[in-house]
A protein has these predicted regions:
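Asp-based, Mg2+/Mn2+-dependent phosphohydrolase catalytic module
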Residues: 1-5, 115-116, 123-206
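N-terminal helical cap/lid subdomain that shapes the substrate entry/recognition surface
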Residues: 2-95, 115-118
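Short beta-strand segments
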Residues: 9-11, 109-113, 169
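Generic structural signal for small/hydrophobic residues in well-ordered secondary structure
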Residues: 11-14, 54, 110, 135, ...
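Alpha-helical elements of Rossmann-like donor-binding domains used by nucleotide-donor carbohydrate transfer enzymes
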Residues: 23-24, 46, 59, 63, ...
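Substrate-recognition/cap helix-loop segment adjacent to the acidic, metal-dependent catalytic center
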Residues: 29, 93-140
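Glycine-/small-residue-rich active-site loops that bind phosphorylated ligands and cofactors
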Residues: 85-88, 107, 142-143
Length: 206
């Protein structure tokens, strides 16, 4: 079994990188309840995902301000202070990535839902990107997970065999999306759980 898989694809946010709007909005709002309401009703996940799929940040911001003028300053903070949302790398998972690279047995890729406008900031900040054999960014491709077509981009571009490929993501929806194109998915919860899952399916770690 340990000779079966030869490719591992990583999600970034929530797996290798700590990104969270709370880092900004805890400085703006007084209570967690206010933050929760704002993120669920104004700058929603669905809204942010549109930009992950390539919609321009300035247009998205202008349109949302027009819809919710009473929240203009708070809405503009979302992308205006985006760098403050970008936390540290998740060290234990990055260490796993290093171990996989050092083994020399696996091709390593990243497949991320991320705006093409903000992704360069992450690329500059984190050294571990050099470990990847390829990176596919939703904002550059104008499509995103869990669309089957998005997974097929990375398969076709790098000539991957889905049957020999593992995909790791903290979103179950995205894991299931990968499985629709024949990739083996792992729903990420924490580094220890990931390490156990990888070893269980025959991936060799130091």
């Amino acid at each position: 079994m340990n000779n079966f898989f030869d490719t591992i694809i990583f999600d970034l946010g929530g797996v290798l990188i700590d990104w969270n709007p709370l880092y900004v909005y805890r400085k703006i709002f007084k209570t967690e309840e206010e933050i929760e309401w704002f993120l669920e009703n104004v700058t929603t996940n669905e809204w942010n995902e549109n930009q992950d799929a390539g919609y321009p940040l300035h247009k998205a911001t202008e349109e949302l301000v027009a819809k919710h003028p009473e929240w203009e300053a708070e809405i503009k903070a979302y992308y205006g202070r985006w760098l403050e949302m970008l936390g540290d790398q998740l060290h234990e998972t990055v260490e796993l990535l290093h171990q996989l690279k050092q083994s020399g047995k696996y091709k390593l890729y990243a497949l991320t839902n991320w705006s093409a406008e903000t992704f360069p900031h992450a690329l500059k900040r984190f050294d571990f990107f050099k470990l990847f054999d390829g990176i596919v960014v939703s904002g550059e491709e104008k499509m995103k997970k869990p669309s089957a077509a998005f997974y097929k981009i990375i398969i076709d571009r790098y000539h991957l065999d889905p049957d020999k490929t593992i995909f790791i993501d903290d979103s179950l929806r995205n894991v299931k999306g990968a499985e629709t194109v024949g990739i083996t998915g792992i729903h990420f919860h924490n580094p220890s759980q990931l390490k156990e899952k990888l070893q269980r399916i025959g991936i060799e770690l130091f």
